[in-house]
């Protein structure tokens, strides 16, 4: 299910393309939920700026896939089907996992908090009925910024940081993980 980093498109995505891509992802999720009546993990990379598909985002994605598989194995949860693809919004993964949806969401939240790259992953868990379990459902604060302690949404809306600073931080986190052989 890994993606080959060297095949990244480096396409600068427009807002309309991004919105269409999100609608297409939602449609794929509904098809998967009909095929597998178990929770669905929908996994993407948080990538600031217009380029969502790069060597860096694919490597971050691949680490996330490895971590999700390890999480399922550790918990004894069966992955019924998994797939990876690249859309205008970057690398995407879907895993149908036979596990209680709320337990799965709590475990993925912990993974996002404990893994060095977890802040760069957006891991959604959908119930078999299609409900997206949110961080808010667990009284968790919104994601924090990569560079400061503010809400990431507030910094993004206000364009608080330079894009190059955010991208450099992403790459530094990835290089640290690769240097330490963290999965």
Curated annotation (Swiss-Prot):
Transferase as UniProt keyword: yes
Name of one Pfam family that matches: CitX
Signal peptide residues on this chain, from the entry's feature table: none
Chain coiled-coil ranges: none
Disulfide bonds: none
EC numbers, comma separated: 2.7.7.61
UniProt GO molecular function: holo-citrate lyase synthase activity
Assigned keywords, A-Z: Nucleotidyltransferase, Transferase
Catalytic activity: apo-[citrate lyase ACP] + 2'-(5''-triphospho-alpha-D-ribosyl)-3'-dephospho-CoA = holo-[citrate lyase ACP] + diphosphate
Any one biological process term the GO annotation gives: prosthetic group biosynthetic process
NCBIfam families: citrate_citX, PRK01392.1
Entry's family note: Belongs to the CitX family.
Function recorded in the entry: Transfers 2-(5''-triphosphoribosyl)-3'-dephosphocoenzyme-A on a serine residue to the apo-acyl carrier protein (gamma chain) of the citrate lyase to yield holo-acyl carrier protein.
Designated name of the protein: Apo-citrate lyase phosphoribosyl-dephospho-CoA transferase
Lineage, highest ranks first: Bacteria, Pseudomonadati, Pseudomonadota, Gammaproteobacteria, Enterobacterales
